[in-house]
């Protein structure tokens, strides 16, 4: 998809990108935006919000968006995800439930229940049936659900509350409180294949799997991101780096890395943070590909579309300063950034 007639190359040649062509999504959520997810089959964007609603938009070639559907939970919605065939949207909520919305029928139904908030939802390929929904909760469990059944087909006990989760087959990675990282191979979905401690010293805020399912990136509240390979023989390629910081003399303002997203074609990735900026990175050449100016508010979540030529990000309060700092004057926007190839393509390592 060519978003509103964009060129295949950027008009900006320096290290700072341009936001002038970014387009705002019409009729955004009315409270903090918690998650964004594009359909793998069409230009549909799902957004979850603290206003207890899930909204689904159609993004047109002009860059304009049209609201296509809306459904509600009984509490703030924290996570959204699409089924592989693009016919269903799953959502997890503070109301301790997960729901699935059918795009074709326009109906939603509760498909999962926990003893505490459902922090993350992901459709997975496991256990010989499809689709299976994995739900990670603050009740310290991961559950798998066959959408045709009212009880989970399997439950995995976790060391702590789920803070972030992502899946690229066969890898399912769950980050919990106390900096635990649980790695699951979906060929054995009820077993924790590897339990590791985050290499970052502070609380995990975001997580995303590599596009080949052989590793993951994690971000912390302390302005750091880490790249982790699953195979021990590639451990020498693991590293972490600083990001989303404002250096002033000998001190620095440090911001949370709220969102990480991998480009579906190139495997390069984005980070977005509480400082109101996002950047594109190449993990293999250890380079920042492009940074972008402040967008006018904290970025709470972000994602690429299926072809990688649209980067969606939400300008919204991220709750990093607690309830008392939230107010009605803060923006709630979803922006669509056209992604020229030269801003996101991998680069050779320096010195080669």
From Swiss-Prot:
The keyword Transport applies. SUPFAM superfamilies: WD40 repeat-like. WD repeats lie at residues 28-58, 72-102, 113-146, 192-229, 252-282. PANTHER family: MRNA EXPORT FACTOR AND BUB3. InterPro entries: G-protein_beta_WD-40_rep, WD40/YVTN_repeat-like_dom_sf, WD40_repeat_dom_sf, WD40_rpt. Disulfide bonds: none annotated. It comes from Schizosaccharomyces pombe (strain 972 / ATCC 24843) (Fission yeast). GO terms for cellular component: cytosol; nuclear envelope; nuclear periphery; nuclear pore. One of its GO terms (biological process) is ribosomal subunit export from nucleus. Keywords: Nucleus, Repeat, Transport, WD repeat. Interacts with rpn15/dss1 and uap56. Belongs to the WD repeat rae1 family. It comes from the Eukaryota. It is found in: Nucleus. This is Poly(A)+ RNA export protein. Its main location: nucleus. The keyword Amino-acid biosynthesis does not apply. GO terms for molecular function: RNA binding; ubiquitin binding. Required for mitotic cell growth as well as for spore germination. Functions in cell cycle progression through trafficking of proteins required for mitosis. Has a role in the mRNA export process. Changing residue 219 to E: Temperature-sensitive mutant that accumulates poly(A)+ RNA in the nucleus.
